[in-house]
Amino acid sequence: MGLAAPRKRTKISHDPNNTTWSRSTDGFGHRILKAQGWTPGSFLGPRNAAHSDLFTTASASHIRVVLKDDNLGLGARPKRGLLDEPTGLDAFKGLLGRLNGKSETQLVVEQQKRDDIKLARYAAAKWQAVRFVSGGLLVQESNETLVPPTSQNGQADSEVKNVPQGREEGLADDETTNSDSEDRHSVEKRKKKETNSRGSREKERKREKRQMRRDKKRKTSESTESEAEMQEKTRVQGPSEDVKPTEPKAPTLSRERRPMGRQMFRGRYIAQKKRALMDDKSLNEIFMIST
């Protein structure tokens, strides 16, 4: 350090390794453990415990804590390199092999082994716990050939006996193919019927929903029009002291429940306010004017 450098005073600690607190025997924890029967160098807990065989020298030392400075979950392994070896080590091994007198064929074989190990480690790190299982083969179950019923005259039995073996196999194959084709046709027809019935049901449901919506809209529009007409009539006639204002007749409610929304309550409140302002008696009560 030259003369132009800033002057810094550094004081060397009496305990540079920070071991005074761990070696002290005057602390509260050390004293209370001794009072409970613990001695320095012994393990915590009962001596005849079931897990006493798993104790090591680290069990008698101080607890060491690892600082967690990442966002990984508990038990997660830190990300390691896929190869975990210095760059160019393969080429260096090949150079050493040439210097030791190995042939090119041996070097190529060793390099191929190293490449295979690299690929295996890369695949194990990228796709963990993936096991590819070959799928089985789907084989159609063959229907058992039905034995033709015996006729009254015994003609069927004689025909079956006289038919050669090759012809019998051909007939059995034809019967199985015919039965399979009939089964397929029946299954296809059943599926078509089911799809048609489902489509018709869905169409009917949609039609009913549309009709219900139209009925609701028509009823709400009729009720709003009737309320507006009654308000206009009361406004034209004007309030009087002797004659009480006729209240509008409530429209006949249908059995279907109408949704009571915020706008309907707000409209009622505004209508009541207008009626109170138009009535002289209510205005006098509001302004506390005695007549």
Curated annotation (Swiss-Prot):
PROSITE patterns: G_PATCH. Residues 15-25, 146-156 have a biased composition (Polar residues). Residues 1-11, 206-219 have a biased composition (Basic residues). Pfam families: G-patch (PF01585). The keyword Cell membrane does not apply. Residues 194-205, 230-247 have a biased composition (Basic and acidic residues). InterPro entries: G_patch_dom (IPR000467), PINX1 (IPR050656). Residues 25-79 form the G-patch domain. GO terms for biological process: rRNA processing. One of its GO terms (molecular function) is nucleic acid binding. It is found in: Nucleus, Nucleolus. Keywords: Nucleus, Ribosome biogenesis, rRNA processing. GO terms for cellular component: nucleolus. Residues 1-26, 146-268 are annotated as: Disordered. It comes from the Eukaryota. Involved in rRNA-processing at A0, A1 and A2 sites and negatively regulates telomerase. Belongs to the PINX1 family. This is Protein pxr1. It comes from Aspergillus clavatus (strain ATCC 1007 / CBS 513.65 / DSM 816 / NCTC 3887 / NRRL 1 / QM 1276 / 107). The gene is pxr1.
